[in-house]
Amino acid sequence: MATKHNNTIQKQFYEKPIIIRHTVGLSNKFGRAPNAIPFPRVDGVPIRSLLQQYGSPLFIVSEQTLRRKYRDMKRAFSLRYPKVQISYSYKTNYLSAICATFQDEGAYAEVVSGFEYEIAKSLNVKGENIIFNGPHKTKEELTRAVSENAIINIDSYDEIYLLEEIAKEKNTTIPVGIRLNMEIGAMHWDRFGFNFESAQAFEAVKRIHAGGLLKLRGLHCHAGTYNDNVEIYRTMAEKFVQFYHIIKERSEEHTSELQSRFG
């Protein structure tokens, strides 16, 4: 460990990578034993027959498990929030069969690119059931999304300007949401969106209202990847409520129609 006393800069400790073959039942480098249990069938179909037909390696997805997990989550939220709407993130896995399964269960399509948007449309997802997120939306993609009444969450001032241009061309006002980033504990995910703590998000709200071409109808936030810490989502929800009251008290936006969207 090398330290500069003047600037208090510490050199990061180097840990040599560990590459070993893990075996079911034995501890890994973190002291945890993998809990994978071999089983011969998936949804009643013998795995050996699938391997004979498609070869190996082979990724197999259980439709029954997907549907059961979705219904469990929907039930858990619906008990407390009857108007909850679950959306499936296409970037997680955009295989058409998987996306179609969640669509059949009632999930909206959450997409982050024109490519994923096209997948949703190929599955006959209605525009109003598509949530269009992502930091790089082209004017062509936004124009299509507006025409098909998709739910659009703005990531930057550039998108505000693009959508205002589209609104002028179509002689209409466009409902939008904005993406917030915020301090949510140990996790830092502030690459995209408008910052809550610095008041950048509120400045974006004022800019949207001043333009007169867009209507704020939603708040969106993404907590990061591989994150199952419930406390982080609690923090996000609390800050969403704080921001809602800030908008209600300090701007002329109609807050009664605002929706919250977590990712």
Set out the residue ranges of the language-model regions.
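A charged N-terminal "starter" segment
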Residues: 1-168, 172-174, 215, 249
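Short connector loops/turns at beta-strand edges and beta->alpha or beta->beta junctions
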Residues: 47, 137, 181-185, 213, ...
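Active-site-proximal beta-alpha loop/turn segments in soluble metabolic enzymes
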Residues: 99, 146-148, 181-193, 218-233, ...
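Alpha-helix N-cap and loop-to-helix initiation/capping positions
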Residues: 137, 155, 192-200, 228-239
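Conserved anion-binding
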Residues: 148, 156-215
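Short, well-ordered amphipathic alpha-helical segments that serve as non-catalytic structural scaffolds
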Residues: 201-206, 237-247
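Phosphate/pyrophosphate-binding loops at sites that engage ATP/ADP/AMP, CoA/4′-phosphopantetheine
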Residues: 208-213, 245-253
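Single conserved hydrophobic/aromatic residue that forms the stacking wall/gate
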Residues: 253-263
